[in-house]
């Protein structure tokens, strides 16, 4: 038989983690003792990576909040005197979009030093033209550079702190721990490339 501690269940949110635990408990209550059910490992991707990295001493446990990323983006735009827009428009519209773009790119493990400026500008222009953008070629190329600069400035601003994407990337680089015989991923079709690598790394 399979030992409960050899089972790892992974979800994307804390809410889903609780729902999964409740479902397992309800379905298993009459078949297995509660003490065995409690030994099943149920985590979010981030909590699993965080626990391993802190227990192993790879990170201090300080997590960067969303406000730090937003402030870093705004600070970079202002330092470069980027974009001829009002501050309220930059703060309310552009910064959130840049923040989401950075998180999306990091979810694929792409760091700012891996981005080729000319190629990025080319791809941005192609994508923008396909959507009949109102922005000029010069504006699109300039914004691409400002985006990469903001991303780099954010990465440079961190010391011992990590954000949620860093956690997953660091886990992949550092994990030498135990593997699980059975790994169950809730909503597996929603995994990105980094999360898929984590599952492959921890599954026997």
Task: List each model region and its residues.
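Post-Walker A helix-loop "phosphate-sensing" segment adjacent to the P-loop in P-loop NTPases
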Residues: 1-5
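A general structural motif at alpha-helix termini
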Residues: 11, 24, 119, 168-171
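Short, mixed-charge, low-aromatic patches
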Residues: 26-31, 124-130, 183-193
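Conserved helicase NTPase motor core
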Residues: 41, 136-204
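Generic structural signal for hydrophobic core residues of well-folded globular domains
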Residues: 52, 56, 105-106, 171, ...
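Coupling/switch/interface segments within P-loop NTPase motor domains and analogous charged loops
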Residues: 67-156
């Amino acid at each position: 038989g399979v030992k409960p501690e050899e089972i790892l269940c992974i979800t994307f949110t804390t809410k889903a983690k609780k729902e999964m635990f409740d479902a397992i408990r309800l379905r298993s209550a009459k078949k297995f003792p509660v003490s065995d059910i409690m030994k099943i490992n149920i985590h979010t991707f981030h909590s699993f990576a965080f626990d391993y990295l802190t227990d192993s001493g790879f990170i201090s446990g300080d997590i960067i909040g969303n406000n730090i990323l937003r402030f870093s983006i705004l600070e970079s735009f202002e330092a470069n005197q980027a974009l001829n827009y009002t501050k309220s428009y930059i703060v309310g519209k552009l910064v959130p979009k840049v923040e989401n773009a950075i998180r999306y790119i990091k979810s694929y493990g792409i760091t700012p030093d891996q981005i080729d400026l000319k190629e990025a500008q080319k791809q941005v222009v192609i994508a923008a033209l396909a959507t009949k953008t109102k922005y000029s070629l010069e504006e699109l190329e300039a914004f691409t550079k400002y985006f990469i600069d903001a991303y780099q400035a954010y990465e440079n601003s961190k010391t011992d702190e990590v954000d949620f994407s860093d956690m997953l990337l660091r886990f992949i680089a550092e994990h030498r721990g135990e593997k699980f015989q059975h790994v169950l991923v809730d909503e597996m079709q929603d995994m990105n490339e980094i999360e898929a690598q984590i599952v492959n790394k921890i599954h026997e």
